[in-house]
Amino acid sequence: DVAWVVDYKTGKSAKYADKGQLELMALTVFAHFPNVHTVKAALLFVVCTAIVKDTYHRASSSTLWEKWLSKYGKMQSAADNDVWNPRTSGLCRRHCAVLECVHNGRN
């Protein structure tokens, strides 16, 4: 069976779309619906009328699980040790509420 998942985005540009969201949605579908073997996923940007699409197959889901479990392991380690190293992103300057962070452009 084939499943379709769409995440509607209100951002102004699809230029920096995070396809990781599509991967996680596909893994969620595979976990909850054993009869689904293909997921067609999309990020639909409603403001700029752009769409980012990808297709995922159950047969290759183990590769995606390895990727995401590795990322989760890093988060779990940070939580266990209460060490949260700051990382810069495009949101730091205008949107971060952590004023004491070295990457916050408003401090």
Predicted stretch roles:
Residues D1-N107:
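RecB-family 4Fe-4S metal-dependent nuclease core
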